[in-house]
Swiss-Prot record:
InterPro entries: NodA, Nodulation_prot_NodA_CS. Gene3D superfamilies: 3.40.630.30. HAMAP family: NodA. GO terms for cellular component: cytosol. One of its GO terms (molecular function) is acyltransferase activity. Keywords: Acyltransferase, Cytoplasm, Nodulation, Plasmid, Transferase. The gene is nodA. N-acyltransferase required for nodulation. Acts in the production of a small, heat-stable compound (nod) that stimulates mitosis in various plant protoplasts. The N-acyl substituent is a C16 unsaturated or an omega-1 hydroxylated fatty acid in R.meliloti. This is Nodulation protein A. Its main location: cytoplasm. It is an enzyme of class 2 (transferase). Its EC number is 2.3.1.-. Belongs to the NodA family.
Length: 196
């Protein structure tokens, strides 16, 4: 079955309050099945969980929002190397559309990534998403790094908790302006901010 979607590529400040409300509901429904904790940041019309994206790719179909991906340019540190990247995050597909191939449509972001002038895009996903991500990487458009820890700031400061968190997610890298073999070596990525 072919899925027809219309992509909207926009800067964050182009979104109106109604857009944030619609995205908030979309994220609660998309992330809620993985646990209430994952849906909580999107209460009250908020359409971001940690860092706010700079650009968004939003796919719409006849029902409403079908898919979403956020993009944020930032410097990360990979091992000893400071690296400008486009972080990809806030990825979601409406639950009724999962396994319909919409993930491959994220290629709609490619021109935007080139416009941003970054050598690589990178994102992190839970290990439970490995099969999904591996299918996407089979065509050589991306590569999965394992055994790499990622340290991020915590978006909400709490006096009783540390201000950073180190995790062991799957790291996915996408070549944009440079080939994959130029990704610097290192077993720790310093995100230098909150997760997107």
């Amino acid at each position: 079955m072919s899925l027809k979607v219309q992509w909207k590529l926009c800067w964050e400040n182009q979104l109106e309050r109604a857009d944030h409300q619609e995205l908030s509901e979309f994220f609660r429904k998309s992330y809620g099945p993985t646990g209430a904790f994952h849906a909580k940041p999107f209460e009250g019309g908020r359409s971001w969980a940690g860092a706010r994206p700079e650009r968004r790719a939003i796919a719409y179909d006849s029902v409403g929002i079908a898919s979403h991906m956020g993009v944020l340019r930032r410097f990360i540190k990979v091992g000893e190397t400071d690296l400008l990247v486009a972080e990809l995050g806030l990825y979601a597909v409406r639950p009724d559309l999962e396994r319909m191939g919409i993930a491959h449509s994220v290629g709609a972001l490619t021109p935007t990534l080139r416009e941003l002038g970054v050598p690589f895009a990178f994102g992190t996903v839970r290990h439970a998403m490995r099969n999904h991500v591996e299918r996407y990487c089979q065509n050589g458009m991306a590569s999965i790094l394992t055994g790499v820890r990622v340290r991020s700031s915590i978006a909400e400061v709490n006096a009783d908790l540390p201000s950073t968190r180190t995790e062991d997610p799957l790291v996915v890298i996408f070549p944009v302006g440079r080939p994959l073999n130029e990704w610097p070596p290192g077993t720790l990525i310093e995100r230098n901010g909150s997760e997107l």
